[in-house]
């Protein structure tokens, strides 16, 4: 199993599948289509049936039941794309067997070193086989680790028919990293009662609470004149953007928050005197606090419009996804089964809120309750990203055990 995990994962991460927020195609990048087509062939090779890839790049497949029991159809999902935060082109995965727990020089020439001082969890992987970057790209364990684990688990179940299970559906979705993963997902065609995203982090992660999320695009319009004769004429758009940001509470930003605390995050700011554009994301676990945060944004905009004119600030704000807890609670047994599966494998479940979102956040509101499970990755979206193959193996075992328990309890 370990060899298959390494072979598949290192091959998959070399395919550039970064999504692109500025693209209006579905999927947003051709690499995701290329990867999807490859997976269609490999799912067929493994022995799955009803393997499809639709015009939007969504890959689906079926592992038929091998029991006569009436077992609910369950699904396992992962996403095809990788993050846009750092380059994902020409990924060169580095395999470190029997890791000694000490610092790893990822790139001597660029002096990129993965250290326990900067990443205190690193020594806990002593003795593991870990896969890192070469210090020039992200790795793509988010979410090619989860995708690999699903492939390996399905292969294992096919070759071990003594493990009884109901019908299992598999799906690989595009554009998760830019919040569009479920946008064209056909829940009815998928046909599962429940699902799990394999899109978590370290060993034991079991998540069924996510942020409520919104995005706010602000355009600040200025008036540019010669600075020598600008008095009472110039309106500096970039300064308007700075003024707006100054109205937000400093301590309610990602770098100052944790746990169940929400935030405002200035994701990008660019412009000049004539026009400046800012993009914020708004996050909170509590629905009332979430609405209050959006109201704060709107109120600041109104104040500035009253001060500088209606055209000075233009706001576009849209909800992106909601806390999945509301939709998971009525079917809490799907969390309990995953919890029990981990415990039976001597894995201590680590239940905590997702300070982010998964496809499951949106899918749960589309009628497919979908908690999230660990994959073994650390430090996602950057050059210090790595994954433990030993933990990936545990994730495969959890998938298998969940499938077995649903059949056993039917």
Swiss-Prot record:
Xref: SUPFAM superfamilies: Bacterial exopeptidase dimerisation domain, Zn-dependent exopeptidases
CDD domains the UniProt entry points to: M20_peptT
Binding sites annotated in the UniProt record for Zn(2+) 2: 142, 177, 381
Cofactor note: Binds 2 Zn(2+) ions per subunit.
GO MF terms held by the record: metallopeptidase activity; tripeptide aminopeptidase activity; zinc ion binding
Swiss-Prot/TrEMBL GO biological process terms: peptide catabolic process; proteolysis
Domain of life, source organism: Bacteria
GO (cellular component) term, any one: cytosol
Family in the record: Belongs to the peptidase M20B family.
Protein name as it appears in the record: Peptidase T
């Amino acid at each position: 199993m370990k060899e298959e995990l390494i072979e598949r994962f290192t091959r998959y991460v070399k395919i550039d599948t970064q999504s692109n927020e500025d693209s209006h195609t579905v999927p947003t990048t051709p690499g995701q289509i290329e990867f999807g087509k490859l997976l269609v062939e490999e799912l067929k090779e493994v022995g799955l049936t009803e393997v499809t890839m639709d015009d939007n790049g969504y890959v689906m497949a079926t592992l038929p039941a091998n029991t006569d029991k009436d077992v609910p159809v369950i699904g396992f999902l992962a996403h095809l794309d990788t993050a846009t935060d750092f380059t994902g082109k020409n990924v060169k995965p580095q395999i470190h067997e029997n890791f000694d727990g000490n610092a790893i020089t990822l790139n001597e020439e660029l002096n990129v070193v993965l250290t326990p001082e900067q990443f205190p969890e690193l020594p806990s992987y002593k003795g593991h086989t870990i896969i890192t970057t070469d210090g020039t790209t992200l790795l793509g364990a988010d979410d090619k680790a989860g995708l690999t684990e699903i492939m390996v688990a399905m292969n294992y179940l096919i070759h071990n028919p003594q493990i009884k299970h109901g019908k299992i559906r598999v799906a690989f979705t595009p554009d998760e990293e830019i919040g569009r993963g479920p946008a064209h997902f056909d829940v009815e065609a998928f046909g599962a009662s429940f699902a799990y995203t394999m899109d978590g982090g370290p060993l034991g992660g079991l998540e069924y609470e996510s942020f409520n999320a919104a995005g706010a695009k602000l355009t600040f319009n200025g008036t540019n004149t010669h600075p020598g004769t600008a008095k009472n004429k110039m309106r500096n758009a970039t300064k308007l953007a700075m003024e707006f940001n100054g109205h937000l509470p400093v301590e309610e930003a990602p770098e100052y928050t944790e746990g169940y605390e929400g935030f405002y995050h200035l994701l990008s700011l660019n412009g000049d005197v004539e026009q400046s554009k800012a993009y914020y994301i708004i996050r909170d676990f509590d629905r009332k606090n979430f609405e209050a945060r959006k109201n704060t944004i709107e109120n600041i905009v109104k104040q500035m419009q009253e001060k500088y004119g209606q055209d000075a600030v233009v706001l576009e704000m849209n909800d992106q996804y909601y806390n999945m807890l509301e939709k998971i609670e009525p079917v809490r047994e799907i969390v309990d089964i995953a919890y029990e599966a981990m415990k039976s494998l001597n894995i201590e479940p680590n239940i905590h809120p997702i300070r982010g979102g998964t496809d499951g956040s949106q899918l749960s509101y589309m009628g497919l309750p979908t908690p999230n499970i660990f994959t073994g990755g650390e430090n996602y979206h950057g050059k210090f990203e790595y994954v433990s193959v030993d933990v990936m193996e545990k994730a495969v075992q959890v998938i298998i055990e969940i499938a077995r328990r649903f059949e056993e309890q039917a």
